[in-house]
Amino acid sequence: MGDIIIEGAKVHNLRDVDVRIPRNSLTVVTGLSGSGKSSLAFDTLYAEGQRRYVESLSAYARQFLDQMQKPDVERIEGLSPAIAIEQRTSGGNPRSIVATVTEIHDYLRLLYGSVGVAHCPKCGKPVRRQSAEQIVETLLKLPAGTKFIIYAPVVKGRKGRHEETLVDIKRAGFVRVRVDGATYPLEDVPALDKKKSHSIDVVVDRLVSTSNSQFVTRLTDSVELGLKTGGGLITVENVGGDAPLVFSEKNACPDCGLSFDELKPRSFSFNSPFGACPECGGLGSIYYFDEDLVVPDKTLPLRECIHPWRRAGHMAIMYYNEILARIARQYKVKLETPYEKLPASFRHKLMHGFDDDLVLPWRKEDKPFAGVLDSVKRMMENAESDERREKFEAYQSYRPCPACHGSRLRPESRAVTVAGKTIVEVMAMPVKDSLAFFKGIQARAVDDPDGLGKTLEPVKDVLKEIVKRLGFLNDVGLDYLTLDRSSSSLSGGEMQRIRLASQIGSGLVGVLYVLDEPTIGLHPRDNEKLIAMLRELRDRGNTVVVVEHDAEMMRTADWIVDLGPGAGREGGRVMYQGPWDGLLKAETLTADYLNGRKKIVPEKVQSSEFKVQSADNAQGIRHKAPGAKFLTISGCTEHNLKNITVRIPLGTFTVVTGVSGSGKSTLIDETLKRELMRRLYHAKAAPGKFRSLKGVENIDKVIEIDQSPIGRTPRSNPATYVGFFSDIRELFAKTEGAKARGYGPGRFSFNVKGGRCETCGGDGVRKLEMSFLPDVYVTCEQCGGRRFNKETLEVKYGGKSIAEILDMTVAEAYDFFAKVPRLAAKLKTLVDVGLGYIGLGQSATTLSGGEAQRIKLATELSRRSTGRTLYLLDEPTTGLHFDDVAKLMRLLLKLREGGNTVVVIEHNVDVMKCADWIIDLGPGGGDAGGNLVCEGPPDAIRKCKESLTGRFL
């Protein structure tokens, strides 16, 4: 097969481009943010590869698959089936963890279900089989007169109608069964839903415990019959209501008398009722009423501080006031005393209950007061509507489940070992440690590692698969992750590398892989491993296309496609395509930075007059020295943080660095940000463990600026997000034409009826639903894509209709509204951040992550600064070209000049050079990280021998 040839691509801003991508090569697509890289790689190449593959399937199969729109391209030849590995997080599924995403969990369940050695959760001794005689002996110890029933399980959690099973039970002479917990005579069993899981137990015998020989004979016969019917398993239920006893010919503890089900892979699944912790349902965490949320303002007096009590109905408030008055009298505290000044022991009793110390009237009887948290829980349970219940959820936080300690599994599953390790212990290990563990037992698979007569020979293929998948995770630089880590806590870059490891594990050949910036989140140290993996993917006979800005990745690529010259309407052209050597000689913006003609490092870091530095005009960087005020967080121990204390100088530009997994996000995002959000905004998310936080009084706002979209619908656009669309509508409403017709500002909105085109609902396009084909969007024939009706478009401001103004670029609008100071100021901030090329009415869904981030920064710059704001950014250079990074640095330093504090998690060496203060965590990832290697200005980091970051600086 020949190369992949693209001719006449016009998706989004692509200008009828022709591109050649050599087959079985590693190709890098680069260019400015918004120049059309994703439009070419994902919306053209991947979309067409995926579409052609899906079209080859039957119409029946196609209806179940997401179908991609046909890209606007004249011809693509030589295309292979395409797989996109995008840089996105996993979504919010709380059950998704690293082990489930990589499918390692399935193999672990198979391993532990096949050769695991069960131990008693109470005493820890290995579980042994029980004979019928041992079971009878145990039951004979029941007190005389105890009524009990012997059940034999025949169906356990299986879907189906089970009609044949019920017929077989009747043939065997039994008359009663228990189906899904309810007991029926066999003739009266209701028809079972074949789509639902059911459990069926045969009622073998009903007995009353006595000491005569007839009872012993009957009990022995019933136990033997039950074991035969239930496949070696019986359940004995005490009619008095005690917990049922499970007896097994296969698994039982000789000392505690506890019996266990036979081990199966589902016993280790937290998504199955047979393996999940009964307390948290397999989630690993539970919601609880949090004292800090119930009493958000601890400076208020006792009579006013309990927030949910103050928001109850009039009668309830009177009742709770009476409770507080009695408590105050008995414990001799004043209702006017601020909550924070009450004794700690009293506060604990007030929240959690007074036991028998304090008895209060409660309906018809006197009861001890169970505490404020219990009363709020009851208020929630008794709420008459979902809306009322949701209000009480605001007082809840979540914490690890106290029953399973966050492991998600039931006690019996947590006590099963292979080679001395439980599945919980294996899942809690970093990937590199679990890889070493499984390689160790793989080497002695024929042995009996537990000394209990179980060899690992039957599962050597399972072990091989586990080792292979762990090896791929290790190779993509994720050796620090634990298998039980929640997917929602992973960054987009980590998630992408997990998907990459899964793809390499699949061993496919002849596939087109399209990746979106796989180096995101990687310290320069880890890049080499990733590049080696992409080469391995290529060498197997696949074509790998990578959207990337990393110079090292470009240097090792076989082919480079450079788009430009600008972004948005000014981009979309191929500036260069060919090998690395040719790019260095090309006249493109990318080449200017790669060969040193331009540099990101600024001339003056203290000034907002931030120009790109020429190589022959290199000047030293002048940093802003830290002042006397610091934000100091002490004793951080969440995840792998080793009890560290970190100082952030206020009013400076601080960069947090360290290799992947060193604890950067844990420190800044999970600990510092969450605690500040709780203190300033009463947010619910619990912060990571730390001892103290000082200096918060010097901060009045915390703003996180990420690369998430500014809106997820076609109606969202820069004009509505930054907030000047309402100003434009006001201007139109003041024109003579609008006044004569009685139009207000609402007439010029495409979100409300009146001025918008009702045929398309103000979208400008109409969706045509095609059975078995992807939906097609066509320009609205009524308004011609202009969104407004004819009457609204007749009103002009400065000779332009509202639709014509929304079609302008930001730069054009800035010139047009130059004499409207309020509007011009907001538009100028967008021009200053390098977004003069985007359209005012451009759909938010077409903006890149870098563009969305710069719009958010422009919005912040357009607001009046208090000089006490803390800005948090996690890897803001994601998706940014060298030139975009220079613009971003100018913006961040502008925020700093207003007296604000900017904290950035970043691996980009040029960003580190511009920092006033660097906090370097490490020295490694996972267990080898979590230490403060050094902190201080860049010079101090350079001189620190232990710092990997210092070497790259």
Spans of model-derived segments:
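Conserved phosphate-binding elements of NTP-dependent enzyme cores
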Residues: 1-953
